Amino acid sequence: MSDEKNKFTDASFENCDLKNPADRNTLKQAADEFLKTHKTEAREDVEEESKEVDPLASLQDENKELKNQLLRLAADMENLRRRTARDVADARAYSIANFARDMLSVSDNLNRALEAIPEGARESDAGLKSLAEGVEMTERAMMAALERHGVQKIHPEGQKFDPHFHQAMFEIPNADVPDNTVQQVVQAGYIIGERVLRPAIVGVAKGGTKEASIETDKASHQ
């Protein structure tokens, strides 16, 4: 709306003669221009507000954030499921570890009892022979039961000494084999699953070349 029309509307309205066709026409034009201007301004304000706050864009952003939260929650739940499954598997595999370790001590005692029988005594004493056979059967049955529950014997003879599975008690001079090669087993070792239940107590060779030790170690990993 022009300044002249504003002046007419504000200052000359009271002096306007409505009976005069020219004044009425001028007043009508001023009113039409006023309404047109304010209608345009109102529409521009609405469009500006729509640009500032777009409901659709806001909903899309919120939906994206919720989707990201859902994906993170799903990932956390999957990690929890895997960790729980692993813990359950470990508990099932290793729950008898302490019991199995105690049974290995019993097996050791049974073997010591058998070794204590003098040579030839079994053949000369039928009762002692039957007793020894019964002890052997008991020991074999007990070890078979432990094997069914994941207990396995370590066979370190001829292998390179590994502190994770072996416990060295003494050295055996022997220049024909690489250093730290297991030469003698004093007490058998056992594992359960991937864990050492009891390390094997061994004697290791002393005097072999380090080069031979390296070559043997490489060959064992090929």
UniProtKB/Swiss-Prot annotation:
<dbReference type="GO" id="GO:0051082">
    <property type="term" value="F:unfolded protein binding"/>
</dbReference>
<dbReference type="GO" id="GO:0006457">
    <property type="term" value="P:protein folding"/>
</dbReference>
<dbReference type="GO" id="GO:0042803">
    <property type="term" value="F:protein homodimerization activity"/>
</dbReference>
<keyword id="KW-0346">Stress response</keyword>
<protein>
    <recommendedName>
        <fullName>Protein GrpE</fullName>
    </recommendedName>
</protein>
<dbReference type="InterPro" id="IPR000740">
    <property type="entry name" value="GrpE"/>
</dbReference>
<keyword id="KW-0963">Cytoplasm</keyword>
<dbReference type="GO" id="GO:0005737">
    <property type="term" value="C:cytoplasm"/>
</dbReference>
<feature type="region of interest" description="Disordered">
    <location>
        <begin position="1"/>
        <end position="21"/>
    </location>
</feature>
<comment type="subunit">
    <text>Homodimer.</text>
</comment>
<dbReference type="InterPro" id="IPR009012">
    <property type="entry name" value="GrpE_head"/>
</dbReference>
<comment type="function">
    <text>Participates actively in the response to hyperosmotic and heat shock by preventing the aggregation of stress-denatured proteins, in association with DnaK and GrpE. It is the nucleotide exchange factor for DnaK and may function as a thermosensor. Unfolded proteins bind initially to DnaJ; upon interaction with the DnaJ-bound protein, DnaK hydrolyzes its bound ATP, resulting in the formation of a stable complex. GrpE releases ADP from DnaK; ATP binding to DnaK triggers the release of the substrate protein, thus completing the reaction cycle.</text>
</comment>
<dbReference type="GO" id="GO:0051087">
    <property type="term" value="F:protein-folding chaperone binding"/>
</dbReference>
<dbReference type="GO" id="GO:0000774">
    <property type="term" value="F:adenyl-nucleotide exchange factor activity"/>
</dbReference>
<comment type="similarity">
    <text>Belongs to the GrpE family.</text>
</comment>
<dbReference type="InterPro" id="IPR013805">
    <property type="entry name" value="GrpE_coiled_coil"/>
</dbReference>
<keyword id="KW-0143">Chaperone</keyword>
<dbReference type="Pfam" id="PF01025">
    <property type="entry name" value="GrpE"/>
</dbReference>
